[in-house]
């Protein structure tokens, strides 16, 4: 692949994990940057770094631009515009785009999905990592695949017509169920794009379980305990 410029997009909480693993395994990459904030620098990679192996890590929520309003002391509201990182990363043209927890872009109408789609179109190669490609309904997989391979499964409506069952909700028709007669066809088409493995199939090939101790603040521990009590 010869990917000199690699971009990882992940949940914010996973950015430090990627940094730790990059330091441990990514010896081929001489430098890395972790993106923060909603307003990027005009050039976040210096000119003397162009052409060297570079790794960039971002979270989904800072890619899309947004408008934020805050109340002023004297009354009224002040509005700020934030551009987001998407355009800067499109201009950077990654050799490889990695989407961690890729089901985050299953919703085509979300701003983050549109931002990731722009970056994906500018990337030479794309890799999506997720254990739950279908979160709630089958259309989730169409949203994800359309970011990675635009048009490969037709429009959202065409996909629903082909692989889902219409259900009348009392007001109109919506596509929720699965067309079992064409499920095997869909699975066959997806194998061209996806690599899926069950734990039972690869358990013997996996290393021994590793336990990692993660330090937390008192408030995090208290919140976790209260959450468990609520579940009970």
Predicted regions: what is each one?
Residues 141-154:
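A short helix-turn-beta junction within AAA+ P-loop NTPase domains corresponding to the substrate/partner-engaging
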Residues 1-3, 115-117, 147-148:
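Walker A/P-loop NTP-binding motif
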Residues 14-39, 148-150:
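Conserved helix-turn-beta segment of the N-terminal RecA-like "Helicase ATP-binding" lobe
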Residues 57-63, 81-91, 110-124, 153-232:
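Inter-lobe coupling linker of SF2 helicases/translocases
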